[in-house]
Amino acid sequence: MALAHPRVKAGLAISGIYDLEPIRHSYLNAKLGLDANASERNSPLQQVAGPDKPLSLVVGSAELPLLRKQTSDFAAHRAVLGLPVTYEEIAGADHFSIMDEMASPQGRITTLIRQLFERTVV
């Protein structure tokens, strides 16, 4: 993840996939070509450590169940590891409409970005 880069101070992930193993067993893998090692190596949910930087995870309440579950699971995983994390479901948002919350100056995602920036700027 880019969050590990030394110049990155914080992150925001929107409607992500944090465990690639289900993808490896789907039709999508015909194009991706993931093997078990690549799936594990590139799945944040499978890591036993992570960057000690703030990460906000957001997902729409109208997203696919897999996206909501993986986002919630990843937030819990980071919390267990003692890593700074927030989790939020955007009411009524799906994989496309959730971006409206970033396009609007008063949108919830815009607010989260602003808060992350304020917390991490020295």
Specify the residue positions occupied by each region the protein language model found.
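Residues at alpha-helix caps and immediate loop-helix transition turns in enzyme cores, especially N-
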Residues: R24, L67-Q70
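Active-site nucleophile elbow and catalytic-triad environment of alpha/beta-hydrolase enzymes
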Residues: L32-V48, K53
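Loop/turn elements at helix/coil->beta-strand transitions in domains of secreted/extracellular proteins
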Residues: R7-A10, K53-P54, L83
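Primarily recognizes the serine-hydrolase "nucleophile elbow" in alpha/beta-hydrolase
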Residues: M1-K31, S39-E40
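Short beta-strand/loop motif that positions the catalytic acidic residue
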Residues: P51, L57-G60
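A general structural signal for stabilizing positions within well-ordered secondary structure
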Residues: A2-L3, Q46-Q47, A79
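C-terminal catalytic histidine-bearing segment of alpha/beta-hydrolase fold enzymes
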Residues: V58, K69-A75, A79-V122
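Acidic catalytic loop of the alpha/beta-hydrolase fold
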Residues: L20, A62-L66
